[in-house]
UniProtKB/Swiss-Prot annotation:
Record's protein name: Envelope glycoprotein I
Family the entry assigns: Belongs to the alphaherpesvirinae glycoprotein I family.
Subcellular localization, as worded in the UniProt entry: Virion membrane; Host cell membrane; Host cell junction; Host Golgi apparatus, Host trans-Golgi network
Superkingdom of origin: Viruses
Organism of origin: Human herpesvirus 1 (strain 17) (HHV-1)
Length: 390
């Protein structure tokens, strides 16, 4: 794989810092606003600030897996300075990841990672930011890093080029040599899918700790120190398959907790996922809280309302009615003097029956007229008989 100078990567990285860039691969895409970081060596020979590369692996468009759960693997290669072949720095194997049209390799059931002891302060994190971090980097960490991503049973891997530039004595340390002497099968562009045992192993006299298999690189990284062993060159072919099983008579060491995926890695959430969960949850909580407040307010108004008495008119204690006794007496005399009239027909009269005029006159007289003296009546004068209405 031809290697370009890191000066070009630095210029491209400075331009990309202003906006996000999506690099699309065959099976997955890398979203980042910077693919390179640079630092300067301090008096003690290390970079005081951490070198960071932010980014996320995402499925874009038709890259979303068709199966409900998928497996995958991620390999990190390093092109060191000088005439040295690339090395495998980190290998991650994920199992049973749920299909999601967003961040790749999230909420996987198991995550196994193997890290090279020659790079103790380098971290590769797929679930959290930053994607690549180097703490107290020395000049040995400078160079080009290649991220190879395998998804499912895809025959081709997605390659993403990253860069770390370190300035020493006023110049940028970069790799400008060709790799024509390296085996083509040991290059990221042509190497097959590697096993976790393919990580770079330094010489026995240079290694401070043996190679370990961890779920997250940060759990086994020792404390940074001013003296960091330099990565050594290696031309040993990488094994492309699983290691051969030992005979039944050989005692196998029990696997430690570091060789298996921890529970934290299974349920690790990114910032975007947390925001996507927090927004609907907060809306539901606000609606529920508002409903409770309205219910309590209505209940308080109901109990505070003063109960007004129902209107009931008062019945009079006594009924007073003025009765014209004289009119009643004359009406009784008329009924006795006249014979009973035949029963009226059932046919309804069209005329409204009128009462006796004398009765009306008597009833219309004021109450004070009854007490006045009446003039004498001549017995010879016939008394007029009032007409009867039929």
């Amino acid at each position: 794989m031809p290697c370009r100078p890191l000066q070009g990567l630095v210029l491209v990285g400075l331009w990309v810092c202003a906006t996000s860039l999506v690099v699309r691969g065959p099976t997955v895409s890398l979203v980042s606003n910077s693919f390179v970081d640079a630092g300067a060596l301090g008096p003690d020979g290390v970079v005081e600030e951490d070198l960071l590369i932010l980014g996320e692996l995402r499925f874009v468009g038709d890259q979303v897996p068709h199966t409900t759960y998928y497996d995958g693997g991620v390999e990190l290669w390093h092109y060191p300075m000088g005439h040295k072949c690339p090395r495998v720095v980190h290998v991650v194997t994920v199992t049973a990841c749920p299909r999601r049209p967003a961040v790749a390799f999230a909420l996987c059931r198991a995550t196994d990672s193997t890290h090279s002891p020659a790079y103790p302060t380098l971290e590769l994190n797929l679930a959290q930011q930053p994607l690549l971090r180097v703490q107290r980097a020395t000049r040995d960490y400078a160079g080009v890093y290649v991220l190879r991503v395998w998804v499912g049973d895809a025959p081709n891997a997605s390659l993403f080029v990253l860069g770390m530039a370190i300035a020493a004595e006023g110049t940028l340390a970069y790799n400008g040599s060709a790799y024509g002497s390296c085996d083509p099968k040991l290059l990221p562009s042509s190497a097959p899918r590697l096993a976790p045992a393919s990580v770079y192993q330094p010489a026995p006299n240079q290694a401070s700790t043996p190679s370990t298999t961890t779920s997250t690189p940060s759990t086994t990284i020792p404390a940074p120190s001013t003296t960091i062993p330099a990565p050594q060159a290696s031309t040993t072919p990488f094994p492309t398959g699983d290691p051969k099983p030992q005979p039944p008579g050989v005692n196998h060491e029990p696997p430690s907790n570091a060789t298996r995926a921890t529970r934290d890695s299974r349920y690790a959430l990114t910032v975007t996922q947390i925001i996507q969960i927090a927004i609907p949850a907060s809306i539901i909580a606000l609606v529920f809280l508002g409903s409770c407040i309205c219910f309590i307010h209505r209940c308080q108004r109901r109990y505070r309302r003063s109960r007004r008495p129902i209107y009931s008119p008062q019945m009079p204690t006594g009924i007073s009615c003025a009765v014209n006794e004289a009119a009643m007496a004359r009406l009784g005399a008329e009924l006795k003097s006249h014979p009973s009239t035949p029963p009226k027909s059932r046919r309804r009269s069209s005329r409204t029956p009128m009462p006796s005029l004398t009765a009306i006159a008597e009833e219309s007289e004021p109450a004070g007229a009854a007490g006045l003296p009446t003039p004498p009546v001549d017995p010879t004068t016939p008394t007029p008989t009032p007409p009867l209405l039929v």
